[in-house]
């Protein structure tokens, strides 16, 4: 019993000596937990607001209020939301709501800087950027963008190869086009129109 009392006294003395530390640690843990809950709640509120703004922008497009919808979509892009920022960029491009190519490229860079993007979503955005800048004929930049995709097992690998083949085919650089078309034919993907590839390969062969 005396030994038990002695141990209890030692514990109480240790607690008293480090009382401030234990209290500070407890307060710190509570603060961290509270901040976590607040950030989680704030993030959900922000995502809801972005979602509502995205829907509003689409409604405005249907009502032909293009300037207002463009402003909303560009604002969503700057929010760097992993879902709605890329979708907003795609709408800007598909609907031709922004004519300044430099701005579009800047928007691409903003979206590509989003940290929590899914890998395949990131690859799709890279492919779309390559397609966009191909209109200005920046060959080296296109290759730089797409090389990591075509040298991977990405679901966008075949689409990237086809785009590069079509890109060079359109400029009558048939040897380069053949290089990419040949890879596609060797892998026999289901999501690519192989008849079109074979037709172009025949044109290259007979050209």
List the predicted regions and their residue ranges.
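Transmembrane signal-anchor/signal-peptide helices with a preference for the extracytoplasmic
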Residues: 32-52
């Amino acid at each position: 019993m005396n030994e038990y009392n002695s141990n209890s006294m030692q514990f109480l003395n240790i607690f008293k000596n480090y009382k401030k530390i234990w209290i500070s640690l407890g307060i710190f843990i509570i603060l961290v937990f509270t901040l976590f809950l607040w950030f989680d709640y704030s993030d959900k509120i922000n995502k809801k607001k972005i979602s509502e703004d995205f829907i509003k922008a689409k409604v405005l497009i249907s009502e032909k209020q293009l300037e207002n919808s463009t402003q909303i979509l560009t604002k969503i892009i700057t929010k760097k939301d992993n879902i709605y920022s890329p979708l907003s960029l795609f709408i800007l491009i598909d609907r031709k709501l922004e004519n300044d190519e430099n701005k579009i490229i800047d928007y691409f860079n903003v979206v590509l800087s989003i940290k929590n993007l899914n890998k395949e979503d990131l690859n799709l955005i890279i492919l779309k950027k390559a397609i966009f800048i191909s209109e200005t004929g920046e060959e080296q930049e296109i290759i730089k963008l797409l090389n990591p995709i075509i040298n991977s097992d990405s679901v966008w690998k075949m689409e990237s190869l086809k785009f590069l083949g079509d890109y060079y085919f359109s400029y009558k650089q048939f040897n380069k086009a053949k290089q990419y078309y040949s890879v596609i034919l060797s892998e026999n993907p289901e999501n690519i129109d192989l008849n079109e590839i074979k037709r172009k390969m025949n044109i290259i062969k007979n050209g």
